[in-house]
Amino acid sequence: MSSAPHDPFYSSPFGPFYRRHTPYMVQPEYRIYEMNKRLQARSEDSDNLWWDAFATEFFEDDATLTLSFCLEDGPKRYTIGRTLIPRYFSTVFEGGVTDLYYILKHSKESYHNSSITVDCDQCTMVTQHGKPMFTKVCTEGRLILEFTFDDLMRIKTWHFTIRQYRELVPRSILPMHAQDPQVLEQLSKNITRMGLTNFTLNYLRLCVILEPMQELMSRHKTYNLSPRDCLKTCLFQKWQRMVAPPAEPTRQPTTKRRKRKNSTSSTSNSSAGNNANSTNSKKKSAAANLSLSSQDVMVVGEPTLMGGEFGDEDERLITRLENTQYDAANGMDDEEDFNNSPALGNNSPWNSKPPANQETKSENPTPQASQ
Protein backbone atom coordinates (compact mmCIF):
# COMPACT_ATOMS: atom_id res chain seq x y z
CA MET A 1 0.00 0.00 0.00
CA SER A 2 1.57 3.23 -1.14
CA SER A 3 1.60 6.13 1.26
CA ALA A 4 0.50 9.64 0.32
CA PRO A 5 3.27 11.96 -0.88
CA HIS A 6 4.75 14.02 1.92
CA ASP A 7 4.03 17.74 1.80
CA PRO A 8 7.18 19.66 2.78
CA PHE A 9 5.05 22.63 3.90
CA TYR A 10 2.72 20.56 6.08
CA SER A 11 3.17 20.92 9.81
CA SER A 12 1.20 18.77 12.21
CA PRO A 13 -0.59 20.63 14.99
CA PHE A 14 0.67 17.95 17.36
CA GLY A 15 4.30 18.38 16.32
CA PRO A 16 6.89 20.65 17.91
CA PHE A 17 6.62 23.23 15.11
CA TYR A 18 3.01 24.23 14.83
CA ARG A 19 2.17 26.73 12.09
CA ARG A 20 -0.33 29.37 13.05
CA HIS A 21 -3.16 30.30 10.74
CA THR A 22 -3.05 33.52 8.82
CA PRO A 23 -4.49 36.32 10.97
CA TYR A 24 -7.86 37.62 9.80
CA MET A 25 -10.28 40.34 10.79
CA VAL A 26 -12.24 39.46 13.94
CA GLN A 27 -16.00 39.33 13.52
CA PRO A 28 -17.92 42.06 15.40
CA GLU A 29 -20.02 39.53 17.31
CA TYR A 30 -16.85 37.87 18.52
CA ARG A 31 -15.83 41.16 20.11
CA ILE A 32 -19.03 41.03 22.18
CA TYR A 33 -18.14 37.47 23.14
CA GLU A 34 -14.71 38.66 24.27
CA MET A 35 -16.31 41.45 26.27
CA ASN A 36 -18.59 38.93 28.01
CA LYS A 37 -15.56 36.82 28.94
CA ARG A 38 -13.78 39.87 30.31
CA LEU A 39 -16.79 40.76 32.46
CA GLN A 40 -16.97 37.20 33.77
CA ALA A 41 -13.29 37.40 34.74
CA ARG A 42 -14.02 40.39 36.97
CA SER A 43 -13.16 39.92 40.63
CA GLU A 44 -14.92 41.38 43.64
CA ASP A 45 -12.06 43.76 44.37
CA SER A 46 -11.80 45.20 40.85
CA ASP A 47 -10.73 48.82 41.16
CA ASN A 48 -11.04 51.81 38.85
CA LEU A 49 -7.84 50.86 37.01
CA TRP A 50 -9.37 47.54 36.00
CA TRP A 51 -12.50 49.23 34.67
CA ASP A 52 -10.42 51.83 32.80
CA ALA A 53 -8.44 49.03 31.16
CA PHE A 54 -11.70 47.28 30.27
CA ALA A 55 -13.09 50.41 28.61
CA THR A 56 -9.81 51.07 26.78
CA GLU A 57 -9.83 47.55 25.34
CA PHE A 58 -13.37 47.64 23.96
CA PHE A 59 -14.24 51.34 23.48
CA GLU A 60 -12.68 54.10 21.39
CA ASP A 61 -11.32 57.27 22.98
CA ASP A 62 -14.28 59.29 21.64
CA ALA A 63 -16.90 56.56 22.15
CA THR A 64 -20.43 57.29 23.36
CA LEU A 65 -22.91 55.01 25.13
CA THR A 66 -26.64 55.69 24.82
CA LEU A 67 -29.50 54.04 26.68
CA SER A 68 -33.14 54.61 25.69
CA PHE A 69 -36.10 53.27 27.65
CA CYS A 70 -39.48 54.31 28.98
CA LEU A 71 -40.26 54.69 32.67
CA GLU A 72 -43.47 55.53 34.49
CA ASP A 73 -42.87 59.27 34.05
CA GLY A 74 -42.12 59.09 30.32
CA PRO A 75 -39.37 58.11 27.88
CA LYS A 76 -35.76 58.56 28.91
CA ARG A 77 -32.57 58.85 26.90
CA TYR A 78 -29.13 59.05 28.48
CA THR A 79 -25.87 59.51 26.57
CA ILE A 80 -22.51 59.37 28.30
CA GLY A 81 -18.99 59.88 26.96
CA ARG A 82 -15.88 57.80 27.08
CA THR A 83 -14.72 59.04 30.50
CA LEU A 84 -17.97 57.95 32.17
CA ILE A 85 -18.34 54.53 30.49
CA PRO A 86 -16.09 52.61 32.97
CA ARG A 87 -18.09 53.92 35.89
CA TYR A 88 -21.35 52.86 34.22
CA PHE A 89 -20.32 49.20 34.03
CA SER A 90 -19.02 49.26 37.58
CA THR A 91 -22.34 50.62 38.89
CA VAL A 92 -24.13 47.63 37.36
CA PHE A 93 -22.21 45.27 39.64
CA GLU A 94 -22.35 47.61 42.61
CA GLY A 95 -26.16 47.44 42.44
CA GLY A 96 -26.20 43.74 43.37
CA VAL A 97 -25.43 42.12 39.99
CA THR A 98 -23.07 39.16 40.08
CA ASP A 99 -22.96 38.35 36.36
CA LEU A 100 -23.55 40.35 33.18
CA TYR A 101 -23.45 39.28 29.53
CA TYR A 102 -25.09 40.13 26.22
CA ILE A 103 -26.72 37.74 23.72
CA LEU A 104 -27.06 38.79 20.07
CA LYS A 105 -29.46 36.97 17.74
CA HIS A 106 -29.91 37.53 14.00
CA SER A 107 -27.69 40.58 13.88
CA LYS A 108 -27.03 42.42 10.62
CA GLU A 109 -23.63 43.78 9.69
CA SER A 110 -22.89 46.59 7.27
CA TYR A 111 -19.37 47.57 6.24
CA HIS A 112 -18.37 51.14 5.52
CA ASN A 113 -15.10 52.84 4.67
CA SER A 114 -13.85 53.25 8.24
CA SER A 115 -16.46 51.51 10.41
CA ILE A 116 -18.61 48.42 10.79
CA THR A 117 -22.20 48.75 11.97
CA VAL A 118 -23.95 45.90 13.77
CA ASP A 119 -27.73 46.13 14.11
CA CYS A 120 -29.27 43.51 16.36
CA ASP A 121 -33.03 43.74 16.86
CA GLN A 122 -33.08 40.78 19.26
CA CYS A 123 -30.48 41.63 21.86
CA THR A 124 -30.80 40.39 25.42
CA MET A 125 -28.87 41.76 28.37
CA VAL A 126 -28.81 39.07 31.05
CA THR A 127 -27.98 39.98 34.66
CA GLN A 128 -27.79 37.65 37.65
CA HIS A 129 -28.83 39.25 40.93
CA GLY A 130 -27.88 37.74 44.28
CA LYS A 131 -29.54 40.37 46.48
CA PRO A 132 -32.03 40.36 48.03
CA MET A 133 -32.72 36.99 46.42
CA PHE A 134 -31.40 35.06 43.47
CA THR A 135 -33.08 36.51 40.38
CA LYS A 136 -32.30 36.38 36.69
CA VAL A 137 -33.28 39.50 34.73
CA CYS A 138 -33.53 39.37 30.93
CA THR A 139 -33.66 42.82 29.35
CA GLU A 140 -34.66 42.69 25.69
CA GLY A 141 -34.20 45.45 23.14
CA ARG A 142 -32.36 46.64 20.08
CA LEU A 143 -28.61 47.13 20.13
CA ILE A 144 -26.81 49.17 17.48
CA LEU A 145 -23.02 49.11 17.58
CA GLU A 146 -20.48 50.91 15.44
CA PHE A 147 -16.98 49.43 15.38
CA THR A 148 -13.87 50.98 13.92
CA PHE A 149 -12.61 49.10 10.87
CA ASP A 150 -9.08 48.41 12.10
CA ASP A 151 -7.09 45.77 13.95
CA LEU A 152 -8.37 46.78 17.39
CA MET A 153 -12.03 46.91 16.30
CA ARG A 154 -13.22 48.93 19.26
CA ILE A 155 -16.73 50.25 19.80
CA LYS A 156 -17.33 53.83 18.72
CA THR A 157 -21.07 54.14 19.42
CA TRP A 158 -23.26 51.97 21.63
CA HIS A 159 -27.04 52.47 21.49
CA PHE A 160 -29.28 50.11 23.44
CA THR A 161 -33.05 50.67 23.21
CA ILE A 162 -34.90 48.68 25.87
CA ARG A 163 -38.35 47.36 24.94
CA GLN A 164 -39.22 44.97 27.76
CA TYR A 165 -37.70 42.99 30.59
CA ARG A 166 -38.45 39.86 32.60
CA GLU A 167 -37.44 38.93 36.13
CA LEU A 168 -37.14 35.17 36.61
CA VAL A 169 -37.24 33.58 40.08
CA PRO A 170 -36.47 29.85 40.64
CA ARG A 171 -39.60 27.81 41.22
CA SER A 172 -37.90 25.92 44.05
CA ILE A 173 -37.95 29.02 46.22
CA LEU A 174 -41.74 29.30 46.35
CA PRO A 175 -42.45 26.08 48.35
CA MET A 176 -39.79 27.05 50.85
CA HIS A 177 -41.53 30.33 51.71
CA ALA A 178 -45.12 29.34 51.08
CA GLN A 179 -46.03 29.89 54.76
CA ASP A 180 -44.34 33.30 54.98
CA PRO A 181 -46.54 35.98 53.42
CA GLN A 182 -43.89 38.69 53.84
CA VAL A 183 -41.36 36.78 51.77
CA LEU A 184 -43.95 36.03 49.11
CA GLU A 185 -44.84 39.71 48.91
CA GLN A 186 -41.18 40.58 48.56
CA LEU A 187 -40.78 38.03 45.77
CA SER A 188 -43.70 39.54 43.89
CA LYS A 189 -42.02 42.97 43.71
CA ASN A 190 -39.63 43.92 40.96
CA ILE A 191 -36.04 44.56 41.89
CA THR A 192 -35.24 46.54 38.73
CA ARG A 193 -36.84 49.24 36.59
CA MET A 194 -36.76 48.31 32.91
CA GLY A 195 -33.98 45.86 33.73
CA LEU A 196 -31.75 48.49 35.38
CA THR A 197 -31.07 48.79 39.09
CA ASN A 198 -31.75 51.97 41.02
CA PHE A 199 -28.01 52.33 41.53
CA THR A 200 -27.47 52.49 37.75
CA LEU A 201 -30.43 54.81 37.17
CA ASN A 202 -29.16 57.26 39.77
CA TYR A 203 -25.77 57.26 38.10
CA LEU A 204 -27.35 57.98 34.69
CA ARG A 205 -29.23 60.91 36.18
CA LEU A 206 -26.00 62.15 37.70
CA CYS A 207 -24.30 61.88 34.31
CA VAL A 208 -26.72 64.48 32.97
CA ILE A 209 -24.95 66.93 35.30
CA LEU A 210 -21.48 65.43 35.05
CA GLU A 211 -21.30 65.28 31.26
CA PRO A 212 -21.44 69.08 30.70
CA MET A 213 -19.01 69.59 33.59
CA GLN A 214 -16.30 67.47 31.99
CA GLU A 215 -14.79 70.57 30.39
CA LEU A 216 -14.78 72.43 33.71
CA MET A 217 -13.16 69.56 35.59
CA SER A 218 -10.56 69.05 32.87
CA ARG A 219 -9.69 72.76 32.85
CA HIS A 220 -9.47 72.81 36.65
CA LYS A 221 -7.16 69.80 36.62
CA THR A 222 -4.95 71.17 33.82
CA TYR A 223 -4.60 74.86 34.74
CA ASN A 224 -5.33 74.62 38.50
CA LEU A 225 -7.94 77.39 38.31
CA SER A 226 -10.76 77.99 40.72
CA PRO A 227 -14.20 76.66 39.73
CA ARG A 228 -15.47 80.21 39.20
CA ASP A 229 -12.57 81.10 36.89
CA CYS A 230 -13.02 77.85 34.96
CA LEU A 231 -16.69 78.65 34.46
CA LYS A 232 -15.90 82.19 33.27
CA THR A 233 -13.31 80.93 30.81
CA CYS A 234 -15.59 78.24 29.38
CA LEU A 235 -18.50 80.66 29.02
CA PHE A 236 -16.28 83.23 27.30
CA GLN A 237 -14.98 80.67 24.81
CA LYS A 238 -18.50 79.45 24.12
CA TRP A 239 -19.64 83.04 23.55
CA GLN A 240 -16.75 83.54 21.11
CA ARG A 241 -17.82 80.48 19.14
CA MET A 242 -21.40 81.75 18.99
CA VAL A 243 -20.57 85.27 17.78
CA ALA A 244 -17.84 84.17 15.38
CA PRO A 245 -18.80 84.81 11.75
CA PRO A 246 -19.69 81.72 9.80
CA ALA A 247 -17.03 80.37 7.57
CA GLU A 248 -17.42 81.31 3.94
CA PRO A 249 -18.33 78.43 1.67
CA THR A 250 -15.47 77.27 -0.44
CA ARG A 251 -15.84 78.39 -4.01
CA GLN A 252 -15.13 75.95 -6.74
CA PRO A 253 -12.26 77.07 -8.97
CA THR A 254 -13.40 78.16 -12.40
CA THR A 255 -12.22 75.95 -15.21
CA LYS A 256 -9.87 77.75 -17.54
CA ARG A 257 -10.05 77.29 -21.25
CA ARG A 258 -6.99 75.81 -22.81
CA LYS A 259 -5.37 78.19 -25.27
CA ARG A 260 -4.05 76.82 -28.52
CA LYS A 261 -0.53 77.91 -29.18
CA ASN A 262 0.62 79.03 -32.62
CA SER A 263 2.49 76.19 -34.30
CA THR A 264 5.92 76.65 -35.82
CA SER A 265 4.71 75.78 -39.30
CA SER A 266 1.96 78.40 -39.32
CA THR A 267 4.39 81.00 -38.01
CA SER A 268 6.96 80.21 -40.71
CA ASN A 269 4.34 80.25 -43.46
CA SER A 270 2.93 83.58 -42.38
CA SER A 271 6.40 85.11 -42.11
CA ALA A 272 7.36 83.80 -45.56
CA GLY A 273 4.22 85.24 -47.13
CA ASN A 274 4.72 88.59 -45.50
CA ASN A 275 8.40 88.81 -46.48
CA ALA A 276 7.53 88.18 -50.14
CA ASN A 277 5.76 91.53 -50.29
CA SER A 278 7.44 94.84 -49.95
CA THR A 279 7.53 96.79 -46.72
CA ASN A 280 4.90 99.26 -47.83
CA SER A 281 2.45 96.66 -49.08
CA LYS A 282 2.88 94.65 -45.85
CA LYS A 283 2.00 97.64 -43.71
CA LYS A 284 -1.02 98.47 -45.87
CA SER A 285 -2.38 94.92 -45.83
CA ALA A 286 -1.93 94.70 -42.07
CA ALA A 287 -3.76 97.98 -41.58
CA ALA A 288 -6.54 97.11 -44.03
CA ASN A 289 -7.24 93.56 -42.92
CA LEU A 290 -6.46 93.33 -39.21
CA SER A 291 -6.09 96.95 -38.12
CA LEU A 292 -4.28 95.79 -34.97
CA SER A 293 -1.36 97.28 -33.13
CA SER A 294 2.02 95.67 -33.47
CA GLN A 295 1.83 94.20 -29.93
CA ASP A 296 -1.53 92.37 -30.20
CA VAL A 297 -1.84 88.69 -31.02
CA MET A 298 -5.11 86.92 -31.81
CA VAL A 299 -5.37 83.49 -30.17
CA VAL A 300 -8.13 81.02 -31.05
CA GLY A 301 -9.21 78.80 -28.18
CA GLU A 302 -10.31 75.23 -28.61
CA PRO A 303 -14.04 74.47 -28.31
CA THR A 304 -14.83 72.96 -24.94
CA LEU A 305 -16.16 69.41 -25.09
CA MET A 306 -17.27 66.81 -22.51
CA GLY A 307 -19.92 68.79 -20.70
CA GLY A 308 -18.35 72.23 -21.06
CA GLU A 309 -19.94 75.45 -22.21
CA PHE A 310 -20.72 75.75 -25.90
CA GLY A 311 -21.09 78.94 -27.85
CA ASP A 312 -23.45 79.60 -30.72
CA GLU A 313 -23.04 76.62 -33.03
CA ASP A 314 -19.84 75.66 -31.19
CA GLU A 315 -17.95 78.78 -32.19
CA ARG A 316 -14.41 79.11 -30.95
CA LEU A 317 -13.57 81.83 -28.50
CA ILE A 318 -11.09 84.42 -29.80
CA THR A 319 -9.03 86.13 -27.13
CA ARG A 320 -6.69 89.06 -27.58
CA LEU A 321 -3.37 88.70 -25.81
CA GLU A 322 -0.63 91.30 -25.53
CA ASN A 323 2.72 90.03 -26.77
CA THR A 324 5.39 92.32 -25.37
CA GLN A 325 8.19 90.34 -27.00
CA TYR A 326 6.84 90.84 -30.54
CA ASP A 327 8.59 93.42 -32.71
CA ALA A 328 6.90 94.50 -35.95
CA ALA A 329 10.18 95.65 -37.48
CA ASN A 330 11.83 92.31 -36.81
CA GLY A 331 12.66 90.39 -39.97
CA MET A 332 12.50 93.35 -42.38
CA ASP A 333 16.24 93.26 -42.94
CA ASP A 334 15.99 89.71 -44.17
CA GLU A 335 13.72 90.65 -47.11
CA GLU A 336 16.65 91.07 -49.50
CA ASP A 337 18.14 87.72 -48.50
CA PHE A 338 14.77 86.07 -49.07
CA ASN A 339 14.30 87.59 -52.53
CA ASN A 340 17.78 86.40 -53.58
CA SER A 341 17.08 82.86 -52.40
CA PRO A 342 17.64 80.13 -55.06
CA ALA A 343 14.27 78.66 -54.13
CA LEU A 344 12.59 81.60 -55.89
CA GLY A 345 12.90 80.57 -59.51
CA ASN A 346 10.96 81.75 -62.53
CA ASN A 347 8.37 79.00 -62.24
CA SER A 348 8.38 78.84 -58.45
CA PRO A 349 4.98 79.22 -56.79
CA TRP A 350 6.64 81.36 -54.11
CA ASN A 351 7.63 83.96 -56.69
CA SER A 352 4.07 84.62 -57.91
CA LYS A 353 2.17 87.41 -56.22
CA PRO A 354 -1.55 87.23 -55.50
CA PRO A 355 -3.91 89.71 -57.14
CA ALA A 356 -4.26 93.05 -55.44
CA ASN A 357 -7.99 92.73 -54.87
CA GLN A 358 -7.65 89.31 -53.16
CA GLU A 359 -7.92 89.43 -49.36
CA THR A 360 -5.32 87.90 -47.12
CA LYS A 361 -7.84 85.72 -45.29
CA SER A 362 -9.42 83.60 -47.99
CA GLU A 363 -11.02 80.23 -47.85
CA ASN A 364 -8.25 78.78 -50.11
CA PRO A 365 -5.02 80.22 -48.74
CA THR A 366 -2.76 78.42 -51.31
CA PRO A 367 -2.13 80.79 -54.30
CA GLN A 368 -2.35 79.46 -57.85
CA ALA A 369 0.54 79.96 -60.25
CA SER A 370 -0.03 82.50 -63.04
CA GLN A 371 -0.26 80.99 -66.45
UniProtKB/Swiss-Prot annotation:
Tissue: First expressed at stages 15-16 in presumptive limb mesoderm. As limb outgrowth proceeds, expressed in the entire limb bud, concentrating in the distal mesoderm throughout limb development. Both hindlimbs and forelimbs exhibit similar expression patterns.
Domain of life: Eukaryota
Low complexity bias: start-end ranges: 263-289
Residues annotated as domain LIM interaction domain (LID): 296-335
Family to which this protein belongs: Belongs to the LDB family.
Protein name: LIM domain-binding protein 2
GO-annotated biological processes: negative regulation of transcription by RNA polymerase II; nervous system development; positive regulation of transcription by RNA polymerase II
MF term (GO), any: transcription coregulator activity
InterPro entries reported for this sequence: LID, LIM-bd/SEUSS
Alphabetical keyword list: Nucleus
Role this protein plays: Binds to the LIM domain of a wide variety of LIM domain-containing transcription factors.
Species name: Gallus gallus (Chicken)
Keyword Nucleus: yes
A single GO cellular-component term on record: nucleus
Lineage: Eukaryota, Metazoa, Chordata, Craniata, Vertebrata
Entry keyword annotation includes Nucleus: yes
Cell location: Nucleus
Region named Disordered: 244-289, 325-371
Main location: nucleus
Gene3D superfamilies associated with the record: Cysteine Rich Protein
Segments of skewed composition (Polar residues): 339-371
